[in-house]
Amino acid sequence: FFSSRRRHTRLVRSRGLGDVYKRQVYNTNSYETLEALRMLDGLVDIYLPDLKYVSGAVSKKYSGTENYFEYAAPAVQEMFRQTGLLELDGDGLANKGVIIRHLVLPGSVDETRRVLKYIAENFPKNITVSLMSQYVPCYKAEKMPPLDRRLLRREYERAVDYCLSLGLENAFIQKMDSAKREYTPVFDGKCD
């Protein structure tokens, strides 16, 4: 995958198609090896990494692997090394940089606090963070309390308050009504 992406990006840039392909954006769950990410150095303009969990137990419960953070933390650091802080053009469009995304899960505000604390302690205070409230229970989550319900307003507000208390300066905060079916990709048609 990475080698074909590198070839494609180089081909696009060598043929002067920059006006067609303005930015190379890499959307990832961050469960990546450093070796793979280094293959993308200089080819990706904007990274959109998720940072889901710090706790191995939570990671195991929800993603089936205890070592998510062991891969994700250095991966996000590498993405930041490659592209730095988010930079916008005169029209407010992203030119380059990293937006670290975190989806606040129902019943998991303590895990969100651990993730935000890690970000605050390991990145500049003006790193861009997207603190997402758009969780919608789908598929097997419908039978896994507390993931069988939507995020409560008070849970999200606690997460936002903590984010701000850490001094993180550039946080995208969502409205609670973003957790709607029409905003959720349908992978198997089983979302409520």
Task: Identify the role of each PLM range.
Residues 1-21:
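Single conserved hydrophobic/aromatic residue that forms the stacking wall/gate
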Residues 15, 34-40:
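Distinct, well-ordered alpha-helical segments
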Residues 19, 79, 156-159:
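Alpha-helix-loop-beta-strand connector modules within alpha/beta enzyme cores
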Residues 25-27, 174:
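Structural motif
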Residues 30-34, 51-69, 98-100, 105-107, ...:
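Conserved radical SAM core fold
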Residues 41-55, 128-135:
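Non-cysteine beta-strand/loop elements that form the S-adenosyl-L-methionine
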Residues 62-63, 70-89:
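Anionic-ligand binding region
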Residues 84-192:
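Auxiliary Fe-S-binding modules of radical SAM enzymes
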